[in-house]
Amino acid sequence: NAFVKGADIGWLPQMEATGYTFYDQDGTEKECLQLLKDRGMNSVRLRVWVNPNTDKASGHCSKEETVAMALRAQKMGMRVMINFHYSDSWADPAKQTKPAAWATHTFSQLLDDVYNHTQEVLNALKTAGVTPEWVQIGNEIPGGMLWPEGSTNNWKQLGQLLNKGYDATKAVDKNIKVIVHVDEGNNNTKFRTFFDNATSQNVKYDIIGLSYYPFWIKKDYTETIADLEFNLNDM
């Protein structure tokens, strides 16, 4: 397979809805994905929120919009990754807020919610003619997801939630590669702690995903790049 060169384009519909236009270096207006493809990008990552609001500036990443964006990318020959946040808005290391519709659900219901939402979105994509190459279960989840039930304070429950996402994905297409994703890719201790616990709970996945943002680490990348290399090799 070709080396993956991609980007998360989840904000593109928001930018287009609020009037952004994109231009080539010579001043010619072009569609954003075409500009990216012209520069060698061959893959996109699309995030999915459960019930986002409808504000044109912040209310994006619904199932319907994700399907539309995936189709746009596929028609340009790009490979597709779907990133499930299991939230109505951003989920990240600082917040893993349950969707409002799931807020009062029992843990047993949350297991069904994860399975059904994952399967529903992937089936909608499949019906539209798009089968993603990768599916990410949760977004930057060193502390778990769907707090508090899916916190890393309760690995037994977190493991079950992650496996529900895996099982739903494979039920749609067994060839989709499932990713589990943690931030701060230069921090081997964080990754060892997370994935050793995941192994102890028999969490199923195909790929370890990591983020590495020197800007947020607050150090020059030259101070942490060797740590990133060590962690990649260790994982």
What residue ranges belong to the model's regions?
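Histidine-centered active-site/metal-ligand motif
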Residues: 85, 170, 213
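N-terminal substrate-binding region of glycoside hydrolase catalytic domains
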Residues: 1-79, 85-114, 120, 136, ...
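Short glycine-centered, acidic/aromatic-flanked micro-motifs in structured strand/loop junctions
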Residues: 48, 180-182, 212
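Active-site cleft segment of glycoside hydrolase catalytic domains centered on the general acid/base Glu
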Residues: 59-67, 91-199, 203-205, 217-230, ...
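A short, flexible beta-alpha/helix-coil linker loop
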Residues: 14-15, 50-53, 142-144, 214-217
